[in-house]
């Protein structure tokens, strides 16, 4: 019981709508809240096979992606500390048919509000319903931005942008990442990414080694992604 109380107290500090809930709604969430510690590489939500519920990241990093008919992956967006994901509970919104997979990119601690619990509260609470709509709109804005990148931006610019994003996330210019991983994020093929990275290396932008990419000239990468 004591551990459960600590879990709920921690959740209160992360869930932005806690103070907008009434006593019964708070109890409903507290009684049904799921805590999960997942290892890097764990699939948390798997397309239309699951209706996991609302995810709230306490610490760690998640990746939300879709699969093409050919099995190629492309990252839609990532989730970091205090981020929430609704696409893992899209089954509660009949107008949304969006099959995504959610994977832990790092060891992650998270909370899950079961889909039916969240759906019930959303029907009762205008603040929760409004916030849900705003969050969903933000995520679809992210997806539309991604589509624009794929349609109108050349691969060299997208790779440069991805490498700069990774250095910002990891806080280092030495990235422990494979060419296959980059291909999965960008919806490309490993061989294509390898050729592009070798071109970058020839231009003095990066240095390649086994399982690692070192950024040598971030300013030129920034210029490339903006050009």
What would you call each of these model-derived segments?
Residues 77-133:
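Cyclic-nucleotide recognition modules
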Residues 41, 52-65, 80-82:
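Glycine- and acidic-residue-biased ligand/ion/polar-headgroup-sensing regions
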Residues 155, 164-227:
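Phosphate-/nucleic-acid-contacting segments
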Residues 1-39, 79, 84, 89-93:
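Cyclic nucleotide-binding regulatory module and flanking cytosolic helices
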Residues 44-49:
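Short phosphate-coordinating micro-motif centered on Lys-Gly-acidic
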